[in-house]
């Protein structure tokens, strides 16, 4: 055991180096950095046989340890396992990989362990293009088990991982490429077939704000980032690490283009004086004959700020260099939470901004912490003093809309609503109505109960109401991606469902669903399509933002386009792509292993090359699956 500790010490001291070596542990000296994965009673301890895992509630409640593996390097991994509870049990040696905070999983090798007998699992593993790697032993239902002699042989990274050349993918001919794809183990998606919610899964996204522009709906979300404790366990979201805002858009509300994560705050942010970027909302206005787009956000709970762009996806600039709303703003000093902006531009071009939240002690029924102010013509200044909206049982999360001649102010209720005469429930979306954008407003009803009532995962409620192509929708957040990942820490994802506006102007209660919105129109594959457009995905990531956003696909990753209309048939497929180490692309119809439309080989060293290949002819409406081998960076694709 002493030899192992020395190796780990050397690796951490040689910052920036890559060192060959062998990690070995028989656990005679302790747990050696291993921890029990999962929540509940699962635990580990060292006994005379090795590392003992017990109290498991599920197969993935297992011993895990993070290893500084280097992308592109191959490792030999082995471990011995024994269980004494079942006649026979299947164990799995697996790896959890994260990229930009999003985890994915891969089973490496399986083995059946008879009761009371040691079994060895051994395999090789080529580390993909990921940020972190956790190796773990799972399976055997909830049986307790012991493992020993865990070994990893290969190159290890220091504290600062250096870039290394990945092993090149060389495909000599079409046959080799076909064999690679036919035998490929595809990565798993976190969005089931038939589910249009959540809107995306490649990152988290909370607190949705909306904007309609050029026949597209844009959704802006808080970019939740997974946080870990000192032992590598996922911990509750503190929101402290959030400094980016996601933006996606769609014309059919099923296939969404990911425009990337806008670097808003932090040292490298557009507003580098801000620490955080929460709860975005957006607006459009023509100023001096030019289209301008305004993105409002809060820097934690102490102010509202604004960015400006010439396109709804950016790039954005910081016009003020400081917050728009602060505690020095009149009538704002006593607002507990100076956050959660909601912007509204009326038909006459006048802009308004709502913000605020929190419940002062003893003021549950009438917190008085919401403010409403008119914006200046430039949308980056205010006119007059912010006024109070007396929203009953308010907690946070403002919204402002106009339907006909009625103005709707909506918000999230607090968590102490019991016994009120209005029928307000905890953590729900309520709404008020008025005949002026500055109020007064009267309470009108409850639109959406807490999402936990539908999905079993309770938490803060945050919403936007939007009219798109003649139908009103509720955009909100839920926690399906973290559930699919097997974690629980209030990491959220955006969803949509329809709103029914009754003849009298009241809003019918909305029911949250995973089915979501039906596709509004067939997808057009003949236009140049951003490669970051997808209905579902598995294992891909999006880097850059605005016109610099690109899709990165690793081995076995894929995206799905839903409902593409091939009314004009197909002759060729073109993709603009790059690959440092070589890659390949397969396009299949209707399922991951469906009829192959075409395949492309992308040689190592390709940079921004347009590849065109012949396709099978196809008619009618089909789903498209774009599957990646090796490593590919894709910009756009098009059918001719």
Language-model regions: role of each:
Residues 15-21:
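Sec-dependent signal peptide cleavage junction
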Residues 21-54, 523-546:
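Extracellular glycan-recognition surfaces and repeat-rich motifs
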Residues 25-27, 61-89, 119-127, 149-150, ...:
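Extra-cytoplasmic beta-strand recognition segments
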Residues 52-71, 90-92, 98-109, 554-570, ...:
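Secreted extracellular polysaccharide-interacting domains
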Residues 62-63, 86-97, 133-135, 582-589:
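Beta-strand acidic-aromatic groove motif in beta-rich domains, primarily in extracellular
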Residues 165-599, 606-640:
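Carbohydrate-active catalytic/glycan-binding domains of CAZyme proteins
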């Amino acid at each position: 055991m002493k030899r192992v500790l020395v190796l780990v010490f050397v690796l951490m001291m040689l910052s920036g180096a890559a060192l060959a070596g062998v990690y070995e542990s028989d656990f005679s000296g302790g747990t050696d950095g291993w921890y029990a994965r999962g929540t509940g009673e699962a635990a580990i301890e060292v006994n005379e046989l090795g590392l003992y895992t017990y109290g498991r509630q599920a197969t993935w409640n297992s011993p895990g340890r993070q290893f500084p593996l280097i992308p592109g390097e191959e490792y030999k991994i082995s471990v011995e396992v024994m269980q004494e509870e079942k006649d026979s049990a299947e164990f799995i040696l697996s790896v959890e990989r994260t990229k930009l905070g999003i985890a994915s999983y891969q089973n490496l090798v399986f083995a059946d362990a008879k009761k009371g007998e040691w079994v060895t699992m051994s395999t090789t593993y080529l580390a993909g293009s990921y940020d972190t790697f956790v190796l773990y032993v799972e399976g055997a239902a909830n049986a307790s088990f012991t493992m020993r002699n865990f070994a990893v042989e290969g190159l290890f990274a220091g504290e600062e991982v250096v870039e290394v050349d990945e092993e090149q993918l060389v495909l000599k001919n079409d046959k080799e490429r076909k064999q690679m794809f036919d035998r490929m183990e595809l990565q798993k998606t976190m969005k089931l077939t038939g589910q249009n919610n959540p809107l995306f899964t490649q990152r988290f996204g909370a607190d949705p704000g909306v904007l309609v522009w050029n026949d597209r709906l844009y959704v802006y979300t808080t970019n939740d980032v997974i946080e870990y404790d000192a032992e590598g366990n996922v911990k509750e979201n503190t929101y402290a690490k959030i400094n980016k805002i996601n933006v996606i858009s769609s014309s059919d509300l099923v296939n969404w283009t990911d425009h990337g994560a806008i670097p808003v705050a932090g040292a490298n942010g557009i507003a580098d004086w801000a620490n955080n970027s929460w709860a975005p909302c957006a607006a459009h206005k023509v100023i001096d004959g030019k289209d301008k787009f305004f993105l409002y956000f809060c820097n934690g709970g102490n102010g509202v700020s604004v960015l400006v762009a010439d396109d709804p996806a950016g790039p954005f600039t910081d016009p003020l260099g400081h917050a728009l709303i602060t505690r020095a703003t009149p009538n704002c000093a006593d607002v507990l939470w100076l956050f959660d902006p909601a912007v509204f531009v009326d038909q006459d071009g006048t802009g308004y901004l709502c913000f605020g939240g929190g419940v002062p002690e003893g003021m549950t029924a009438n917190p008085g912490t919401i403010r409403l102010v008119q914006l200046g013509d430039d949308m980056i200044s205010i006119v007059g003093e912010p006024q109070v909206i007396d929203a009953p049982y308010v907690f946070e999360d403002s919204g402002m809309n106009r339907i006909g001649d009625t103005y709707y102010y909506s918000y999230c209720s607090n968590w102490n609503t019991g016994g009120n005469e209005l029928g307000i429930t905890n953590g729900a979306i309520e709404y008020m109505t008025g005949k002026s954008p500055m109020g007064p407003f009267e309470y009108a009803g409850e639109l959406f109960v807490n999402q936990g009532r539908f999905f079993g995962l309770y938490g803060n409620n945050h919403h936007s109401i939007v009219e798109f192509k003649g139908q009103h929708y509720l955009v909100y957040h839920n926690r399906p991606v973290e559930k699919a990942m097997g974690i629980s820490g209030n990491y959220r994802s955006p969803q949509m469902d329809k709103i029914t506006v009754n003849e009298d102007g009241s809003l019918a209660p909305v029911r949250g669903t995973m089915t979501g919105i039906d596709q509004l129109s067939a997808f057009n594959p003949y236009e140049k399509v951003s490669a970051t457009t997808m209905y579902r995905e598995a294992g891909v990531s999006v880097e850059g933002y605005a016109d610099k956003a690109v899709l990165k696909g690793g081995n076995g990753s894929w995206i799905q386009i839903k409902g593409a209309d091939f009314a004009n048939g197909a002759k060729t497929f073109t993709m603009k792509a790059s690959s440092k180490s070589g890659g390949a692309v397969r396009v299949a119809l209707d399922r991951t292993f469906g009829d192959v439309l075409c395949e492309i080989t992308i040689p190592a060293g390709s940079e921004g090359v347009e590849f065109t290949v012949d396709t099978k002819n196809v008619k009618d409406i089909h789903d498209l699956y774009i599957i990646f081998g090796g490593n590919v960076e894709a910009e756009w694709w098009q059918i001719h």
